[in-house]
């Protein structure tokens, strides 16, 4: 088969792929059909067919690859966990992964707010700084509030995951996964607007 969006596969240092695929198609439960295994990049039949760009950027040197697996064979010792345990392993990793990614998004929003504040106090129009024009101070204040709310939700998700385990944390992780990305998109968009044309250039 083929897999797209294999992040980091284009890096020369990438020696192994962590592959999840169906190994038990006859299992009664769909969640028991997948397994996870290590596949060396130099295994016969493993081919990078193309690198995928994102908005025109190739994200070199790591990049995102499309990989073809043609009759690839590996030893049973490359299996991670047990046969059919792949979905369980992946789900266990995704909980902490989602918390991590949301915290990174909060960091990006924090940086965007920092730039927004700097721009609003250093750029003058009509004899006044931008912070004193058109309700911009409200935009900044709302961004600060939304970041703090999202941060608390992420911290709650992390605490619940650490203290009570994944199953108890699933609900708050799901909430966080909705709230945090939307917050980050809103704050970053406001920062772009505050910078005008500069906001979509490499200067910012």
Language model feature labels by segment:
Residues 2-49:
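A short core secondary-structure module
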Residues 3, 10, 23, 43, ...:
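A broadly conserved detector of short glycine/acidic/proline-rich loop/turn motifs that flank catalytic sites
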Residues 15, 63, 174:
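Exposed loop/turn and edge beta-strand positions of beta-sandwich/beta-sheet ligand-binding modules
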Residues 42-73:
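Flexible, small-/acidic-enriched active-site or ligand-binding loops
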Residues 47-48, 78-83:
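Cytochrome P450 core scaffold surrounding the K-helix E-X-X-R motif
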Residues 56, 77-80, 127-128:
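Short beta-strand/turn micro-motifs at beta-sheet edges
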Residues 66-71, 82-87, 91-204:
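Alpha-helical interface subdomain recognition
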